[in-house]
Amino acid sequence: MFVQEEKIFAGKVLRLHICAADGAEWLEEATEDTSVEKLKESCLKHGAHGSLEDPKNVTHHKLIHAASERVLSDSKTILEENIQDQDVLLLIKKRVPSPLPKMADVSAEEKKKQEQKAPDKDAILRATANLPACSTDRTAVQTTMRDFQTELRKILVSLIEVAQKLLALNPDAVELFKKANAMLDEDEDERVDETALRQLTEMGFPESRASKALRLNHMSVPQAMEWLIEHSEDPAIDTPLPGHAAQAGASAAATTSSTSSEAAVGTSVEDEESRDELTEIFKKIRRKKEFRADARAVISLMEMGFDEKEVIDALRVNNNQQNAACEWLLGDRKPSPEELDQGIDPNSPLFQAILDNPVVQLGLTNPKTLLAFEDMLENPLNSTQWMNDPETGPVMLQISRIFQTLNRT
């Protein structure tokens, strides 16, 4: 019996389950020494007739071992890929890579990017080389924009004068401002908390020192006690706070002048008496609302070598802000304290627009508005409180809107 040589040395025959991408399934027989590429050709003959006419078709497909999800290498045999009998292989067409862009497309894309690119400094200079030079005074442009907080003080000074004249015509104004004056007497900031003062005196501290410590530490007993202990050996501990003694003297002088003026008013006509009394109340309110420098800031700045009057002026100009006051003292000292009491030009478009506003006109006849203006004039940090007040808030809002509108135009 004659047996072919290749069959004598042939490897083990494996039965493999082949699955195509279109869902077709069949059994393919191959020996262990068959290459993956030969197996793929056989599968393509079975699955797609005539597909081998294109020699590149074999390279466009791949076999995947389903169990291990491995792509089989064309150069290896079935044995080398560790394929077993009854294994499942997937015949899948390879994903065609996207074609490279043509040179024309690349050039068009680059050109588009260049067109969208912002010009650099050299390009701007080249494009504007033939244009006439135009110099702009940027400093002058910036200074034309006025700061609202700076202008607000001038506006308030002028509006207070207008409000005083309007309220002097109100027959009930004297009684209204007497009540306001009494409220200020009850709610004065300089008054020391009696409970806190008693706690410190019961600990053995002298009353004068305890009062000074409480004023310096915003009526906080623990901080005041700590300050008294730290400064117990300080020779200046009994020195009155800057401006405190002066304020007491001013209050006494004010009381004397008030008494004498009331005696003089008694000899006047009733209308003049009422007007003078109202003027006197205005003065009292102004004195009680006058600026009070932060004692800690005064001491800190005086320790730097500045005079007490200069320090108080600096804190008044800068709303009790110590750092800003220090910069003011070291700088050109603008604005000056005298400028703070100057009102806005009564003939200016801004002031005329404010006075023509109906909301402002109505608010100026309200005594509470005058008190609010006085308070904001001496304590600018209280502006937020009055902006949220239902009576004074609308007036302040209209003033702000008018200022912003005219400032932009």
From Swiss-Prot:
This is Ubiquitin-associated domain-containing protein 1. Residues 108-122 have a biased composition (Basic and acidic residues). It comes from the Eukaryota. Component of the KPC complex composed of RNF123/KPC1 and UBAC1/KPC2. Interacts (via ubiquitin-like domain) with RNF123. Interacts (via ubiquitin-like and UBA domains) with the proteasome via its N-terminal domain. Residues 187-231, 292-332 form the UBA domain. Residues 101-122, 239-273 are annotated as: Disordered. The keyword Repeat applies. GO terms for cellular component: cytosol; Golgi apparatus; plasma membrane. Residues 357-396 form the STI1 domain.
